[in-house]
Swiss-Prot record:
Gene3D superfamilies: P-loop containing nucleotide triphosphate hydrolases (3.40.50.300). Residues 2-245 form the ABC transporter domain. It is an enzyme of class 7 (translocase). Keywords: ATP-binding, Cell inner membrane, Cell membrane, Membrane, Nucleotide-binding, Phosphonate transport, Translocase, Transport. It is a peripheral membrane protein. This is Phosphonates import ATP-binding protein PhnC. Its EC number is 7.3.2.2. One of its GO terms (cellular component) is plasma membrane. SMART domains: AAA. It comes from the Bacteria. Belongs to the ABC transporter superfamily. Phosphonates importer (TC 3.A.1.9.1) family. It is found in: Cell inner membrane. PROSITE patterns: ABC_TRANSPORTER_1, ABC_TRANSPORTER_2, PHNC.
Length: 281
């Protein structure tokens, strides 16, 4: 069980997140929607403790996450994997190494500094890449990949952490519709197959409806909607996104990312190369 209790964040006089209280059962997939500046990203960064709450508390499995320090905090950031819109990869390092960096908080400092990884870690990393259909990129510099491929590498890196919770901050904001679907399919697969809680910030209403069993709407730093996709009425959407200058509500087709694609794509295959051979194993 994950809980936020009256979590607030101020930046000077600006109230970015205003007394948010949420309870999320283990294994739920939650989409947080709202306009830019609604407080979505700040909320996720506080959950991961990349930013500190000004007040309120955060709890996971009975532990007050907002009070953790030192090694306990590093362990939480390992257990609560974060996926960013900007991917946060090391462009000059190959894809395989970027994925294995997800093991940093599981390893000794010396091994991490020397980038020495075990055979088991390499096998695990290749399996994560294979699961996301990009094992053929294992030895390429991460900076040479497309945006969609880089986001899948970031998801593979998150899997390497063996997380209990995954936070995805606008994971498809910079992607085309095809890659957006691939990334969202991957997040849903993680949620359904491992039973890992996934909380993702999204701009697009159709994506939230199609992938998330629960939707949280934010406006002005506050939660103004919390319910099932079927409960997200036109009035609720208007409260979340506001109206245009004529007072009309938002047209959901303006945020659509819908696209129909086959489950498997030929360019995701590794042309017969065995996955372990890609890692020199």
């Amino acid at each position: 069980m994950f809980e936020l209790k009256d979590v607030t964040r101020r930046f000077g006089k600006k109230l970015a997140v205003d007394a948010v209280t949420l309870t999320i059962p283990q294994g739920q997939m939650v989409g947080i929607i709202g306009r830019s500046g609604a407080g979505k990203s700040t909320l996720l960064r506080m959950i991961n403790r990349l930013q500190e709450p000004s007040s309120g508390s955060i709890h996971f499995a009975g532990v007050e996450v907002s009070g953790l320090r030192g090694r306990a905090l590093r362990n939480w950031q390992r257990d609560c994997a974060m996926i960013f819109q900007q991917f946060n990869l090391v462009p000059r390092l190959d894809v395989l190494t970027n994925v294995m960096l997800g093991r940093l908080n599981h390893r000794s400092t010396l091994l991490s500094l020397l980038n020495i990884f075990t055979r088991e870690e390499r096998v695990h990393a290749i399996a994560a890449l294979e699961r996301l259909g990009i094992e053929q990129t294992a030895l390429q510099p991460a900076g040479t990949l497309s945006g969609g491929q880089q986001q899948r590498v970031a998801i593979a890196r998150a899997l390497m952490q063996n997380p209990k919770m995954v936070l995805a901050d606008e994971p498809i904001a910079s992607l085309d519709p095809l890659n957006a679907k691939i990334v969202m399919d991957a997040l849903r697969d993680i949620n359904e197959r491992e039973g890992i809680t996934v909380v993702t910030n999204l701009h697009t209403l159709d994506t939230a409806r199609n992938y998330c069993e629960r939707i949280v709407g934010m406006a002005g730093g506050r939660v103004v909607f919390d319910g099932k996709p079927s409960d997200l009425t036109a009035e609720a959407v208007k409260e979340i996104y506001g109206t245009d200058k004529d007072g009309a509500g938002i047209d959901e087709t303006m945020t659509s990312t819908s696209i129909d694609i086959a489950p498997e794509r030929a360019d995701n295959q590794s042309a017969g190369i065995q996955p372990l051979a890609l890692a020199g194993l």
